[in-house]
Amino acid sequence: MTFWSILRQRCWGLVLVVAGVCVITFIISHLIPGDPARLLAGDRASDAIVENIRQQLGLDQPLYVQFYRYVSDLFHGDLGTSIRTGRPVLEELRIFFPATLELAFGALLLALLIGIPLGILSAVWRNRWLDHLVRIMAITGISTPAFWLGLGVIVLFYGHLQILPGGGRLDDWLDPPTHVTGFYLLDALLEGNGEVFFNALQHLILPALTLAFVHLGIVARQIRSAMLEQLSEDYIRTARASGLPGWYIVLCYALPNALIPSITVLGLALGDLLYGAVLTETVFAWPGMGAWVVTSIQALDFPAVMGFAVVVSFAYVLVNLVVDLLYLWIDPRIGRGGGE
C-alpha cells in the first residue's frame, strides 16, 4: 500500500467514526430525562412560555427532523447554538478548548518525562525493586479514579503543605495574558510576563500530574517491554562485544528502536487525555471543556454536549491518523507489509 492509499483509508475511517459519534451522541442526549425548555424557562414559567421556547429551539419537531438539521448545519461548520448561554457552540469551544489542550499537553509531557526514564531503568534492572515498583504504579494508575486522586493531591499539596495552588489557571489578583493561542504559558512568554508564566505553571502542575498518573505507568511498561525486546537482539550483543559502554548502548542503540513501537501508545495517550480531562477539570475548577460540558449536561444543553463529543472524537481520530502516518514514515515496511 502506498502512502496516499493509507491516507485515504484513514480519512474514510475518520469520517465514519465522527459520523457514528454524531448518531450515538444525538440518541443518548435525547434519551436523557428532562426538558431543556423547562430548565431554560424556570420552574415558575407557564406552559405557554415553555412551549414557545421549545418551538424556538426546534425541540417540538420530530427527532429525525432535528437530526437532519443538526447534520446539515454540521456540514456547514455550524455546531449549533448553546441552549444555556445562547452563544454559538463553536465560539464557546474556541474559548474553552485551549485550556483543555494545555492541560492535556502538560499531562502528556509529565507522563513522558517520568515514564520513559522509569521504563528504561525498569528494563535495565529487570525483576528488581524498581521493576516491581513500576508494575505496581501502572496497576494503581489504571485502577485509581481521577477525581479521588485529584482530591488527594489537593489536600496534600494545597491543604497541608501549602506549596501549590489547588484550582484555577491563575490567581484571582492576576490578569490573564493577552489572548494569542489561548495557552496561558505560551501567551505569557509571548507577552514577556514572567510573573503570569510562573503562576500559570504552578496552577498547571497538580491537574497535569493527576491526569498524567494513569498514563505514566502505561508509558513506562510499554517502554520497558520494547527495551527488553531490543536488548535481546543480536546487534546489542555485537555492540557489547565491541566494548561500548553499557549506558551508550542503552541510550543510543536500544532506546531509538524501542521508541518506534511506542509511538502508537503515546498517540493514543494524548487522545485519552482529552477525554480524561473532564473529571480532572471539574475537581480542579480548571476552566476548560471538561468543566464546561459537565455544566452543559446538567442543563440538558444538547447542542453543547453533541458539539463537545464531535470535536473531541475528531481530535482523537486525527491524532491517531497523525500517529499512523508518522509510524509509516519512520518504518516504511508497514506500508509494504500491508500491501502483501
Curated annotation (Swiss-Prot):
InterPro entries in the cross-refs = BPD_transp_1_N, MetI-like, MetI-like_sf
Similarity annotation: Belongs to the binding-protein-dependent transport system permease family. OppBC subfamily.
What GO CC terms are in its UniProt record? ATP-binding cassette (ABC) transporter complex, substrate-binding subunit-containing; membrane; plasma membrane
Q: Which CDD domains match?
A: TM_PBP2 (cd06261)
**What assembly does the database describe for this protein?**
The complex is composed of two ATP-binding proteins (DdpD and DdpF), two transmembrane proteins (DdpB and DdpC) and a solute-binding protein (DdpA).
The record's Gene3D superfamilies line, in alphabetical order, gives: MetI-like
> What are its GO biological-process terms?
dipeptide transport; protein transport
Q: How does it sit in the membrane?
A: Multi-pass membrane protein
Q: What is this protein called?
A: Probable D,D-dipeptide transport system permease protein DdpB
Could you list which ranges are Cytoplasmic topological domains? 33-104, 157-199, 270-279, 323-340
